[in-house]
């Protein structure tokens, strides 16, 4: 009763009640991979701030009349700097507006959700974090590459590859210092590299230098779970050249480890679940290349000595 009376008195005095911010994970890309809670919140949103990684199909789930604001956060350019995004959310909430902050994957896995939650907490703004299926989980399922497997990997590690060439990290990820290469190069482990396309040659070189075999299976999954998904499979030695050859673009994840070899068996079935194309054979850079998949899902597997089955 006391709380209700105080709220009533505040309204009488003309005080604006701050709005609430929902930090919502949009999942790996496909709209039907949203959680039930995320779908419900999105369907009721009146004001939505989203990153460039959120797929158009998900944005279409917002109700008619909802205000959608792209705040960017692409690696090559930012529509708004991170500090400005937090300031905008705080300002909108203080003006009495509740809003949805929609982020690709899960907000707390390389989504800067933790920083945004800290900013809201420091400003006294009420917020809620709604988890999402991570990009790594979506990529693993849609590419047919399990993150763990008793015969291949007893651990999995997520890392960001978005760093400066001098290894000192960068302002976007807040990464201070180089990656722990010894940790990433452990045997019987799956390493998933987020935002790693720009530094892929360095990542592969460092992993080999720290003990992983050059023929360790590795893959890039581009646009996981979405139309146009591509899975490029090679090894640590060949993957950077394959990424350049096939003009791979973000959003994409890099997966490294023995589990990648299971793609040859599980990839087609995984592709069928997400989408169904005739195999195309070709030759590129001296390697036999097979493109296969289903509907809009394409697999590019180079057949080189010590990497993958000879099909």
Tell me what each language-model feature is.
Residues 1-31, 36-133, 138, 240, ...:
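Class I S-adenosyl-L-methionine
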Residues 59-60, 79, 110, 138-139, ...:
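Short secondary-structure boundary/hinge segments and terminal tails
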Residues 106-187, 230-233, 308-309:
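Class I SAM-dependent methyltransferase SAM-binding "motif I" and its flanking Rossmann-like core
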């Amino acid at each position: 009763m006391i709380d209700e009376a105080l709220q009533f008195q505040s309204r009488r005095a003309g005080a604006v009640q701050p709005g609430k911010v929902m930090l919502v994970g949009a999942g790996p890309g496909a709209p039907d991979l949203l959680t039930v809670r995320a779908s419900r919140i999105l369907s009721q949103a009146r004001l939505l701030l989203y990153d460039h990684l959120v797929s158009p199909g998900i944005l279409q789930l917002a109700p008619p009349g909802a205000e959608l604001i792209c705040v960017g956060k692409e690696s090559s350019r930012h529509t708004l700097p991170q500090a400005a995004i937090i300031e905008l959310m705080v300002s909108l909430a203080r003006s009495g507006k509740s809003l949805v902050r929609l982020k690709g994957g899960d907000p707390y896995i390389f989504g800067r959700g933790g920083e945004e939650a800290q900013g809201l907490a420091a400003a006294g703004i009420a917020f809620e974090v709604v988890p999402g299926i991570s990009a790594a989980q979506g990529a693993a399922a849609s590419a047919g590459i399990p993150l763990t497997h008793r015969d291949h990997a007893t651990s999995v590690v997520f890392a960001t590859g978005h760093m400066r060439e001098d290894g000192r990290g960068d302002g976007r990820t807040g990464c201070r210092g180089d990656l722990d290469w010894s940790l990433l190069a452990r045997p019987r482990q799956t390493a998933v590299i987020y935002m790693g396309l720009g530094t892929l040659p360095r990542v592969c070189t460092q992993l080999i230098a720290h003990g992983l075999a050059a023929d360790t299976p590795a893959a890039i999954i581009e646009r996981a779970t979405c139309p146009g998904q591509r899975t490029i499979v090679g090894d640590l030695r060949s993957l950077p050249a394959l990424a350049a050859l096939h003009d791979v673009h973000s959003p994409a994840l890099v997966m490294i480890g023995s589990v990648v070899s299971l793609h040859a068996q599980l990839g087609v079935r995984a592709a069928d679940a997400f989408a169904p194309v005739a195999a195309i054979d070709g030759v590129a850079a001296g390697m036999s290349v097979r493109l296969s998949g289903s509907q809009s899902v394409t697999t590019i597997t180079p057949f080189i000595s010590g990497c993958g089955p000879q099909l």
